[in-house]
């Protein structure tokens, strides 16, 4: 579930809810999730677990439900007690973003201030935090901050063991994106996030030198990820999966145009050859 290899193929990115809407409970969201695509989505196993990587927001709904059933607490309360309080993350939680004092607010791509949105999955989308608090969370995953971490060093290292692959590359650990290999056989890791209105975030860490990058962006849909990709290349000499996807996407239109030109020339030369014969 953590590595998107459980056999779910929903590809679910969570849609937002207006400030005055009532959020569904966890079971209702599992049965009828609101997808960012606006299309109906079913959360079901379609592949043998462990055989393929497919992004699945539904997996994180199930993880949220597992935490609640095993702990006997609401997911938000459990994370508050076991993660936020030990790390003294006092500006972090799952409340509606517009209810936080001194919130930076939400901006559209034109820079206009917008009403914040609610999100139905706490585990996947609803976290609100500050850059200072997120720095504490990232530090706890380094050797320097191990004493304050709610996880053992062994658990943190296990998060970076590859479980998900795409196009032959290791891209996902246990809840972490594996951006690029380091020189000692480890991975630059972390996670990016994106949602409406024009929210983009990145928290990336190099365990080899304990350098990190934290970006919380509102008003641009990809700025944090774009800068994060440059940072990964600077740190490792390798492009990350987001940069690679962008290169492939940029090649599609020229590739199609080139194919069309080749086919057109082939037809013309074919006709010319027939006339000559």
Give residue spans per PLM region.
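Short, surface-exposed loop or secondary-structure junction motifs
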Residues: 1-189, 196
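Short, low-complexity, polar/charged sequence segments that are solvent-exposed and flexible
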Residues: 20-23, 208-210, 232-237
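Low-complexity, compositionally biased segments
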Residues: 28-31, 136, 209, 229, ...
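Generic low-polarity alpha-helical segments
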Residues: 72, 208, 213-214, 264-266
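Small/flexible residues
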Residues: 97, 206, 274-276
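Extracytoplasmic/lumenal ectodomains and periplasmic regions of secretory and membrane proteins
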Residues: 125, 163-164, 176, 180-231
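Short, gly/Ser/Thr-rich active-site loops of penicillin-recognizing serine hydrolases
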Residues: 168-172, 181-188, 216-277
């Amino acid at each position: 579930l953590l590595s998107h290899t459980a056999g779910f193929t929903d590809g679910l990115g969570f849609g937002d809810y207006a400030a005055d809407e009532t959020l569904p409970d966890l079971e209702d969201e599992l049965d009828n999730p609101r997808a960012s695509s606006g299309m109906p989505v079913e959360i079901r196993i379609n592949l043998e677990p462990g055989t393929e990587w497919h992004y699945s927001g539904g997996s994180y709904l199930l993880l949220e439900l597992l935490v609640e059933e095993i702990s006997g607490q609401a997911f938000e309360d459990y994370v508050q007690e076991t993660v936020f309080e030990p790390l003294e993350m006092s500006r972090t939680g799952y409340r509606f973003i517009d209810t936080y004092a001194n919130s930076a607010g939400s901006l559209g791509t034109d820079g206009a201030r917008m009403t914040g949105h609610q999100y139905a999955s706490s585990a996947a989308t609803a976290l609100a935090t500050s850059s200072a608090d997120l720095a504490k969370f990232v530090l706890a995953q380094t050797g320097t901050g191990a004493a304050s971490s709610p996880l053992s060093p062994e658990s943190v290292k296990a998060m970076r063991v590859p479980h998900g692959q795409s196009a032959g590359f290791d891209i996902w650990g246990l809840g972490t994106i594996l951006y690029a290999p380091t020189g000692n056989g480890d991975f630059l890791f972390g996670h990016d996030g994106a949602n409406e209105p024009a929210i983009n975030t990145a928290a990336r860490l190099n365990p080899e030198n304990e350098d990190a990058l934290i970006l919380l962006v509102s008003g641009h849909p990809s700025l944090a990820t774009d800068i994060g990709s440059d940072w990964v290349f600077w740190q490792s000499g390798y492009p990350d999966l987001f940069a690679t996807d962008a290169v492939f996407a940029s090649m599609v239109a020229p590739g199609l145009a080139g194919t069309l030109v080749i086919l057109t020339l082939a037809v013309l030369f074919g006709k010319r050859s027939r006339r000559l014969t």
